[in-house]
Amino acid sequence: LPLVLYGGYAMIFVGVTCLLFSILYTTRLSYIGMGDILVLLFFGLVPVTMTYYLEMPMYMQGFTNEVIVASVACGMVIDTLLIVNNYRDIDNDRRAGKITLVVSIGPSVSRRLYLIVGFFACLMGLVFAFMGSYWAFVLPAIYLFFHVITYRKMVKIDKGSELNKILGETARNIFFYGLLVSIGLLL
């Protein structure tokens, strides 16, 4: 409710939409491969753009390229967590009829997708560099070091509960990415 007082009635729409899709995800959407798209939307675009909307003065309300790039990049980095989770659960999901992206493309391509999604999230930072925020591109590149190490471990483990360690490392990497982008944008 305080967000509505501060951000206006648009925040009611955002809140209701988030609630609706969180419910739909637990029912049908996760069974038809929509998880990755929903992560990009509701862990990337919605929180980053709405935070910008709430924090910027009314006369600066237009969304900038930096905001859109940051939101997509955040969604992509967070999607790596969903990829690992679905990779770990691929056999159970297949048996349950849950057609995640990982089930659709198989384990081999999914492992590469994990690596590529993290790489492209960092590559999106080039937009920051072209707009003069050089450090917002350079610092998040440190994330790639940890991301590649985690990927190499993931490939060796392949499947099972040992992948829980990879989930933890991926969550840590996401934290590093967010911290490094934030510091880079402040410099």
For the regions a language model picked out, list residue spans one by one.
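Interhelical loop and helix-boundary elements at the membrane-water interface
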Residues: F21-F43, I90-L115, Y151-L180
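Membrane-interfacial segments
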Residues: G33, L54-Y59, R88-N92, G132-A136, ...
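Intramembrane alpha-helical segments
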Residues: L1-M58
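Hydrophobic alpha-helical transmembrane segments
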Residues: I12-V16, I37-L41, V67-V72, R111-L115, ...
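Transmembrane helix-loop-helix
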Residues: L1-T26, I116-G160
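Membrane-helix interfacial "entry" motifs
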Residues: G7, R28-I32, M58-V67, G132, ...
